[in-house]
Every structure is written in C-alpha cells, then in structure tokens.
Amino acid sequence: MTIAITIISSLLFLIVGLVVGSLIFKSSTEKKLAAARGTAELIVEDAKKEAETTKKEALLEAKEENHRLRTEIENELRGRRTETQKAENRLLQREENLDRKDTSLSKREATLERKEESISKRQQQIEEKESKLAEMIQAEQTELERISALSKEEAKSIILNQVEDELTHDTAIMVKETENRAKEESDKKAKNILSLAIQRCAADHVAETTVSVVTLPNDEMKGRIIGREGRNIRTLETLTGIDLIIDDTPEAVILSGFDPIRREIARIALEKLVQDGRIHPARIEEMVDKARKEVDEHIREVGEQATFEVGIHSIHPDLIKILGRLRYRTSYGQNVLNHSLEVSKLAGILAGELGEDVTLAKRAGLLHDIGKAIDHEIEGSHVEIGVELATKYKENDVVINSIASHHGDTEATSVIAVLVAAADALSAARPGARSETLENYIRRLEKLEEISESYDGVEKSYAIQAGREVRIIVEPDTIDDLSSYRLARDIRKRIEEELDYPGHIKVTVIRETRAVEYAK
C-alpha cells in the first residue's frame, strides 16, 4: 500500500511535473516568440530607417551632383562668353586700328602729294636758276675774252706783282719766326736775370691786423677808462675814431680800427693815460694831441730810415713824411712800406744786371706806391695821386713814368719803368705776400668814411665796430639839429645804394657845441 501510494505519488508528481514543465516550456516559448517578434520588428524598423537614410543620402548626392554639373556648365558657359567677348573686343580694336591706319595712309598720301608738288616746283626753280647761271657764265666768259686782250708789258706786270706778293708773304713768315726765336731767347735771359735778382733779395713779411692791445696794471683801470656813464671811453673813441673793446680779457684793452695811424695814436694816448693815472675828457684830449704829434714824428723818422736803407738821398722832406705814412698802410694784408723797400731793392738788382742806373731804379721802386699813403684822403687812384706828388716835388721824369706805368695804365717810356713794374709784380705775387680778404674789409671801411665825408658840414667821420657803425662829427655852426637827422638819413641811403655789406650799419651823427670862457 505504501508502495502503491509511493508510485501513485510519483506518478502524480511526474504528471504534475510534466504539466508544469509543459506550461513553463510553453511560457518560455511564447516569450522567445515575443522576443523574436520584437527583434524582427526592430530589425524591420532599422531596415526601414536605414533605407530611408540611404534614400535621403542618395537624393542629397544626386542633388549635389546635379548642382556640381550645373555649376560646371555655367562656368564653362561663362568662360565661353568671356572668350567670345574678348574676341569681339579684339575684332573691334583691329577694326579701329585699320581705320586709323587708313586715315594715316590717307594723310601720308596727301603729304606725299604736297611734297611731290613742292619738289616739282623746286626742280623747276633749280632749272630756271641753272639756266640763268649758264647765261651769266656765258656773259662772264664773253667779258673775260674781251678784257684778256692785254699787252706784253701788262701781263709781265701782273706776273711780277704776283711774285712780289709771294716773296712778301715768305719774308713775313721768316721775320715772324726770327721774332719768335728772339722772344724765346729773351724770355730765357729774363728768367735767368729775375732768378738771380730774387736769390739776392729776401724780405720778411708779417700780415697786418686791425687790432692793438694795451696792457693794464690791473682790472680796476678798466672802470676808470670807461669813466662815469662812459664819458671817458666815448671821448677817446670820438677823438681817435677807434673802437675800444673792454671785455673779460684780464688786464688788457683791445683797440680795433682799420686805420693803423689812428689806432697807433689811440694806443699811445691810452698808454700815457694809464701811466699818468688821470683819466678825464680834458686829459684825454691833451694826450691824444701829444700822441698825434709823436706819431707824426715817428712817421718822419720811418721815412728817413727807408731812404737810408736803400741809399736814396735828396728827397723832399714832405715826400719823406708821406713815404713814412706807408708804414701804416697795407695792401691786401702786405705792408706797403715793406713792399716798396722790396720793390726798390729788386729794381736796383735788375737794373744792375741790365747795366741801367741802379740808384734811379731804386728811387723809382721806392716811390712807385707813394700815392697809397693818402689815397683815402684825396680823390683818385693811388697811381694818379702818386704822379701828382712826384710832379709836385719835382722828381725825375723816369720816376714819374715808373709810377704812372707800374700797373699798365700808361705806356712805359724807359727800361727802368719796366723793371719797376716787374719788381712790383714779383713782390706782390709771391705766395703769402697778400691777403685779399683783409684788403676788401679795409676798402669797405674806407668807403664808409668817404661817403660820410662827402657831405658839406662834416668835420670828420670814423668807421668803428668792424664797420657796423660809422660816426660822423659835424660842424655845429653849419649843421643844426634837424639837419643832423636829415644828414644821417641821406648817408644811410647812399650806403645802402653803393656798398655791399652783411648785417646792418649804424649811422651816428654827433653835433657838439662848446662854450668856453676864461675868468681873469
């Protein structure tokens, strides 16, 4: 029974197990089917989506290909249109060129036609002239045939005249060649003589300056020289015409002026004032007068020394004094007295070499520039003034001619005059002997004073401040105060018209009236 129960139970369990197993299997199968259906649906859905995507991509590619093809076609069409347009433009340009060439050819044809007409006319004129020329030649031949009926003597005379002309020409050539050879030989001899003369004459030259320096014992003396409100320095500048420069230079005062004589007078007067110690306007006037007399005496001594140096005697005392003034005169920076002494010595040496009068040659050389001593005081060139002085003091005619001809203004009438001119050129042309800049500066200052002193009533004028100022001292009885202004204006106008100068020039007219009484 137990076994039966066990079997039944086992069968029941088996049946139940089979049923449960079948149910589980069925459920599992249904789930798998459902999962398979879901997977199939997903696959179908994905396939649809992929197909849709592929379709869209295909459409997009088709559109892009279509756009690309359209663009290529349009570009190709555009390029063809451009080429077509260019071809049309080239054709138009060719047509224009052809038109221009056609026009140019037409003009050339017209020009050629005109030239042909002109050539035809010229040819016609030439033929007419040739015809006239032939007629003239025929007429001349006829006339010559008529005239040629000469006698034997006439033909001989013509031949002799021709021979004479040829001989005269040949003789002139021979004479010219002889003259050239003589000139060459004379040039060689002259150079030899000049070289000997130069070797035997040597002179030192120092370039002149336009300033002098006065040494002071101490710097306090500068204030005394200036004076109260500058009256002392103004008085000294007015009396001498020299510009006093008082600056930071220790224990020194600089005197500036282009006239060496006035500068020397100012230097001596100032040195005497400094030595004396009493410096006031009255004392300054006294010292300037003494200095002027001292300089005049020194000028006379210098003139005598110059004549003694070259061995010249019996010169008029006044001419000796004028000669001494050359010590304070420069020409292009060369001291004129030293230059005259050098010319005198050179002329004497040259005269000795040529057998001429040595003493007379030295005399002419010494006095050849005598006019330069006073050419800034008298109208005329230094040559004209020198001739007048030599004539006035009864110098030899050879000396007078040497003065007149040493610059070629007058023809030399003697060998000595030629020698003086040569010696003058030797002395002046030596390198370093002269400086044109200083001479031009001095000439400008002299011209300033000359313009100022050309007016009536002007007593004296001084160019100072290196030519930047000209001071004119007038006669108070002749020029009143109003006339002083007018005079300054007139002088200013003449300076502007006649002079070339840098910067400005101050024109100062000084009118001073003095009333002097003596108490007894």
Curated annotation (Swiss-Prot):
- Primary localization class, coarse: membrane
The keyword Transmembrane helix belongs to this UniProt entry's keyword annotation: yes
The HD domain, residue ranges: 336-429
Quote one Gene Ontology molecular function term.
RNA endonuclease activity
Q: How does it sit in the membrane?
A: Single-pass membrane protein
**EC code:** 3.1.-.-
Q: Which SUPFAM superfamilies match?
A: Eukaryotic type KH-domain (KH-domain type I) (SSF54791), HD-domain/PDEase-like (SSF109604)
Which locations, inside or outside the cell, does it occupy? Cell membrane
Picking any one GO biological process from the record gives: mRNA catabolic process
Q: Which UniProt keywords apply?
A: Cell membrane, Endonuclease, Hydrolase, Membrane, Nuclease, RNA-binding, Transmembrane, Transmembrane helix
Which sequence ranges are marked TM in the entry?
5-25
**Entry GO terms, CC:** plasma membrane
Taking every annotated instance into account, which residue ranges of this chain make up the domain KH?
A: 210-273
Q: Give me the ranges of the annotated region Disordered.
A: 70-127
**Family the UniProt entry places it in:** Belongs to the RNase Y family.
Described by its record, this protein's role is as follows:
Endoribonuclease that initiates mRNA decay.
Database matches in NCBIfam families: HDIG, RNase_Y
Protein name as catalogued = Ribonuclease Y
* Native source species: Listeria welshimeri serovar 6b (strain ATCC 35897 / DSM 20650 / CCUG 15529 / CIP 8149 / NCTC 11857 / SLCC 5334 / V8)
Taxonomic path: Bacteria, Bacillati, Bacillota, Bacilli, Bacillales
Name of the encoding gene: rny
